[in-house]
Amino acid sequence: MKTRELILKLFDEAYEKKTWHGPNLKQSIRGVSAKQAAWRPGAERHNIWEETLHAAYWKYTVRRGIEGGKRGSFALKGSNFFPRPEKGRENEAAWSADRKLLEREHRALRKTIEAVVDTPRGRKFLRKIYGVAFHDVYHAGQIRLLRRLMGH
């Protein structure tokens, strides 16, 4: 298998394609309600909603690095973890909007990876590219654990 094929396969499996290791990131948030996404296992602990946006942010960060984009251009103000739900927005529409942000950032990064993976610039970023796939799998596992802890 060529590097291009392997990288795209890893990237796709970590987010949405069938895998041998269990649910990927997209499968892990499927069927989760806003109320469930907002549940915390304890004070000062992240919830599913925050983990979802965290994954979106790091997809953006890797893409921005590859493209040489401007810092601070993420759709949300802040970085890394975003407190959710926002006061007065503890609803399905807000949760759906944030899931769509994850999807958009994933699609944008995949498009960038496809364009550069075979170039010298792409090779320079290979570690971050496969790293973001591992990051998705890591957080998919956290989300699955949170779902079990809440009995879902």
Language-model-derived ranges and their functions:
Residues 2-4, 8-22, 26-29, 34-82, ...:
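Short, contiguous alpha-helical
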Residues 83-120, 127-132:
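Acidic/histidine-rich alpha-helical segments that form the ligand environment
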